[in-house]
Amino acid sequence: PSLVVTSKGTLLALCEGRTKNDDHAANDLVLKRSGDGGRSWSKLQLVRDEGEATCNDPVMTVLDDGRVLLFFARFPAEARTKEVVPGFEGKVTRHLVMHSDDDGVTWSAPQEVTRMVKPANAQATSQGAGAGIQLKAGPHKGRVLVPMWQRVGEGEKVETFAFAAISDDGGATWHHSQPVPHGRGDGRPWHNISEAALIELSDGRLMMNGRNANGPVPFHRKL
């Protein structure tokens, strides 16, 4: 799910609309809006229906100009995380971006950005969860960051890494970062991190909280 407050103070709560208890159940994307701080909510609004394909892991980002970006993954019909393949053709995960300029009342048609944000060797990729951010300070002020994760390898050699989708033009074009480093000084990536969230701290540093994809420790924090 993704929950944001727009520049006009409207609450937008968006999530997967599931018909079955399954991550990949031909999910739609559905939304409710609140203009009174959450005391009352609109009727359920269908934002995106991909037919038998599945919409997963929606992430909204509120931009300084009031636009709301919606980033989500599209999995082929009946294909789960372990069943999609690397690359950009065939049975692959795809990534799409929509936007709203009226506080979520209407939404644009989706723009596919898969080749911009998906590493070619990644077997599966997805976003979030939660919300993206737009940097408020520093040399990259205005940059949009969406937390993402990638699954690389096969069988017992599978690893997951956190990274970010990056836009410097308000979401028109994107590129992706390298995997987030572990921070031990050896340049190695932060291993086995899947769903993650990003915030910008008051001193300009970025903090990421991530879910451990396997192992005894459920969550990690990275500065």
Question: Which role fits each region the language model picked out?
Answer:
Residues P1-L223:
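Asp-box/BNR beta-propeller blade signature and adjacent active/binding-site loops
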